[in-house]
Swiss-Prot record:
Stretches the record annotates as Disordered: 598-646
Record-linked HAMAP family: DnaK (MF_00332)
Keywords on record: ATP-binding, Chaperone, Nucleotide-binding, Phosphoprotein, Stress response
Protein name per Swiss-Prot or TrEMBL: Chaperone protein DnaK
Entry-annotated residues carrying Phosphothreonine: T199
Biological function: Acts as a chaperone.
Keyword set includes DNA damage: no
Induction of its expression: By stress conditions e.g. heat shock.
Source organism: Leptospira interrogans serogroup Icterohaemorrhagiae serovar copenhageni (strain Fiocruz L1-130)
NCBIfam families listed in its UniProt record: PRK00290.1 (NF001413), PRK05183.1 (NF003520), prok_dnaK (TIGR02350)
Amino acid sequence: MSKEKIIGIDLGTTNSVVSVMEGGDPVVIQNSEGARTTPSIVAFTAKGETLIGQFAKNQAITNAVNTIRSAKRFIGRRLNECESEMKHVSYKVIRSGNEGVKFETSAGEFTPQEISARVLMKMKQTAEDYLGQKVTKAVITVPAYFNDEQRQATKDAGRIAGLEVERIINEPTAAALAYGFDKKNVNSKIAVYDLGGGTFDISILELADGVFEVKSTNGDTHLGGDDFDMAIMEWMISEFKNQTGIDISADKNTVQRLKEAAEKAKIELSGTMSTQINLPFITADASGPKHLDMTLTRAKFDQLTKSLVDRTRIPCENALRDAGLKASDINEVILVGGSIRIPAVQELVKQVFGKEPNKSVNPDEVVAIGAAIQGGVLAGEVSDVLLLDVTPLSLGIETLGGVMTKLIERNTTIPTKKSQVFSTAADNQSAVSIHVLQGEREMASANRTLGRFDLIGIPPAPRGVPQIEVTFDIDANGIVHVSAKDLGTGKEQKIRIESSSGLSEDEIQKMVKDAEAHAAADKAQREVIEAKNELDTLTYSLEKTVNEAGDKIGANEKQLATDEIKRAREAIESNDKARIESAKASISKIATDIASKVYSQSAPGAEQAAAGGPNGGAGSNDQGNSTNNGEKVVDADYTVVDDEKK
């Protein structure tokens, strides 16, 4: 029996493609209908049948409420994050569990993972028919800006389809792999501009001697060909209402007809200057049947979709900046996805990068080909290719004052692992709560919560003494694992991040944009919080020193310290940075004077108390928080657990 193949699948919003390595080269496999692409559509008929692909698409107009398309736009998202999609689909979208999404049909309720699994099953069967053997392993592509939940949901869809997902790889990276597969001796910098049916990605890569290294990635998880179709649909609905006074947007079957007509018009306008949209018997009123007959010019189409095209510009500029490159440094721009055929899109690419885009690859098939090549690498069929991908957004945890402390920066090569030592923020704290975040903002509340977990059973100790090592581990699929370990006791808690949903429309891109727009305000707020934390630590240490000093210091010195501690606490409450800095200077001087006096009067063996003076206290991000090996200790957010109530 021949060695089991690892197939490559491009699970697209609009269409899906399957490919496999044969004789050292990738081959795109035709489906049972003789097509190399399969519509990512699933339908449930009145007879109890499940139709997938072209057969499902063919009956969509007459069975709109039971025909699910663009499921990828819902996968890994909360219901309230899908409001714009829900307005433009012909099927019913309902709540699943706490916050998830399901599709309601006559055959039952289905999650986006289940619908995607049906499409993957079609791809799996297509490969098995071609290879003449069972297929159980696959590499599946996802948009580069898919978050952890969406990647896991895609893996779940594969598992439902009976596939062991050997690797999740980013679509632009897969495209670069396909483009450079036969150019291993060429050293070049390329940009992959990927505008698909539901998502947009831009990745900057460097190709050198068979190594494909992603330098940066950016994008918009809710921008694609569907949005161009919707723009045409909304124009048709508005024009028809102006002409007849009838709103045709409420009927699901009519919406499906409009969707197909809009998609057809969009495609035609890539090759012609105008197109005729003719939908007879679109509706009726008391005077009889009504027909929709309109002419859409390319100029009007460009006007309707200009804002959509422009939304791809800033991600391109950000990706270049993050890669440390200028547009002139890019040797080739590769176009991927069906929507890149739109002339206005190609013109924007030319403007941004200053060169004609490379059109040598098939934009519909190149991603699946790259997935097959990666499958060949994992199966041992391809040995001279190395793929180095990145994580698109920064990861970290919330620390004292509501600050996000980043452990892994965006565009870090994966797989990767990073640890940092944190400490407690209160005396005798027996538990810490780890709040895992994703995003670029300085404050935790402005970033995306990926999950929370607790590490309990920490032995009683003064704040700052326990050492809690938090470790982030991102695997080659871009999926996040987090652990927290008490270095004193060895107790450890591990989780794989499993949030209830994915990100909202434009949310990941919005994180980066908001970070840039609010950079100054975020920085100022963070500086105030860090100054407050430092002053709090100094105050705590001084108070402890005074209490332990006893009669080693005089009454006047004690009163001076007490007054300064009161003034420091008032400064902490004020949020006035200048006042906080002034209090820090004053309390540092007093603390140093008292510590010196106590030290000079101490008996041998008492130095440790003095050493715990102004800079020895725990809880600050920047002062006196070092482990024996020099690792930085940062204050962690915490939850106090009452042992008597357990």
